[in-house]
């Protein structure tokens, strides 16, 4: 499974690791992903999403039903 947030679409990005002498070597910045289980009252079931910390905050603000509608509108499964 890829390291992508299902709500925000955050994914790993690349950059440089810098030593004290400012030598550059490539590195990856990974999103802060968590598997989180939500109860969907309308469907009477749990769903598990792979979310970044920001994605969890968005669901706290908008509600799980509204966020799932946005995911469906993009044509994605959850």
From Swiss-Prot:
Segments passing through the bilayer: none
A GO CC term attached to the entry: cytosolic large ribosomal subunit
Source taxon at top rank: Bacteria
Designated gene of the protein: rpmB
Alphabetized GO MF terms: structural constituent of ribosome
Disulfide-linked positions: none
GO BP field: translation
Name of the molecule in the record: Large ribosomal subunit protein bL28
Keyword annotations: Ribonucleoprotein, Ribosomal protein
One of the Pfam families matching this protein, by short name: Ribosomal_L28
Keyword match Ion transport: no
Keyword Ribonucleoprotein among record annotations: yes
Similarity section: Belongs to the bacterial ribosomal protein bL28 family.
């Amino acid at each position: 499974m890829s390291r992508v947030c299902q709500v925000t679409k955050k994914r790993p990005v690349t950059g440089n690791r810098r030593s004290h002498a400012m030598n550059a070597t490539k590195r990856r910045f990974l999103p802060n992903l968590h598997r989180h289980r939500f109860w969907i009252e309308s469907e009477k079931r749990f769903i598990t999403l792979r979310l970044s910390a920001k994605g969890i905050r968005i669901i706290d603000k908008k509600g799980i039903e509204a966020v799932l509608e946005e995911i469906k509108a993009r044509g994605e499964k959850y």
